[in-house]
């Protein structure tokens, strides 16, 4: 009996939204690892990518999905040629990516970066899938809408971000009233020890060089500004039944303790591991079971020391902006996210200075609040409208700085 329990095979019909990005590639690595060891039997329903035809075609030939979608419609012909004779259904454009989210998978990795991931992820949630959520924007922009869809469909939301995944593993959902606070840990990014004066000259190349994690450019910049931690604060307030004022942020440069839960009896439970996204991905893939993962094991003897410090609000104003956004609620977090996305893109293209990312974001928040006042969020369309307004305003502010 014990042997049979140890050899229980995990069976999934899986979709990976954003399969060619960092999280998507790691997800397929986790699936491949478990499958080759006989721990999992996985049918791939759909894979999607934004524009990386070559990698999407390579993944499709290996994992044999029923459906693949490329978001950039101009690349459909190239993808059709690359998969000629493979017998795989091919779609292109945002509607095809949305279709991928609605297809019949019981486990969906939502790893499309940015607002583009909202509709396909919501489709998966409405259908009752277990949604492994790596897209911050879904909960930041439309948290109430997404969580309502999960509850109404009887599905599940499984956080992939290492911090939320850590809390998910040690949070007592049966007795949330016994939780005193959540502690989100942050590496502090590459500029943790830099003065504000030094940060005025930060280049895109420096900002994307994260000290611990391997991530995409946009997420790396968010880590450098600590906006990623601000967005995670907003996410956590949706995932866990804890008010935002009881969610703290603590800088932990080694990225070994991924987050903590403090209970009313002063006990603190933490999840530890090497800084490898495959660990939280494997946790969501096998949930509520566990499966082998190719991540390196933690060597406690080699750690020697773990350090902690409070974040510096004067050097990382994004944290204050995020707290203000979650307190205002409604569409304000969506405005924050859209303005930040536009500002980060401008920084990466050389149009905006590093410290101006938070400056532009703050201006957009204030202007939208002045125009519209507090606005409730009841639908994805309202979130998308706020997103569009914030992006347009951010672009005008960025252009004015260019002039």
Residues of each region from the PLM?
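Catalytic, metal-anchored helix/loop core of enzyme active sites in primary metabolism
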Residues: 1-403
